[in-house]
Amino acid sequence: MTTINKEEIQKFSNLADEWWDVKGKFKPLHMFNPIRIEYILGKIKQHFNLSGGKNNLLKNFEILDIGCGGGLISEPMARLGANVTGIDASEKNIKVASLHSEKNKLKINYLNKSPEQLNSQKKYDIILS
């Protein structure tokens, strides 16, 4: 059994260069992303009983972002101090995400893998998908 849909991977691979264009095809996602991040942070704060501001809120948290695409969730989590691993089945998405995070001086471990291929002994505090 696999979670990989080859047509979906190809569709997002074809759009890979658009991920960080706020006026491009992912414009609605960029507009929605701040709300999505706030929602995720609210759930994390609630689950882990965290309080305080955002500065280093996620310090020492291990986060796995499954289907990370261009890194639109991975990057904000890393900015908040998390150790982020982003995986995506599209090699092109991983290249775009890696270049963008390097450009922004963020340490994110991006891997071109599916969840089944990850086979990690590492434990994650938070898994996003």
Where are these regions (language model features)?
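N-terminal, positively charged/glycine-rich alpha-helical extensions of SAM-dependent methyltransferases
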Residues: 1-26
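Conserved alpha-helix/loop element of class I SAM-dependent methyltransferases that forms part
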Residues: 31-59
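Conserved class I S-adenosyl-L-methionine
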Residues: 59-67
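Class I SAM-dependent methyltransferase SAM/SAH-binding core
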Residues: 64, 72-117
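Glycine-rich phosphate-binding loop signature in dinucleotide/nucleotide-binding domains
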Residues: 120-122
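Conserved acidic residues
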Residues: 125
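A conserved beta-strand element that flanks and buttresses the S-adenosyl-L-methionine
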Residues: 128
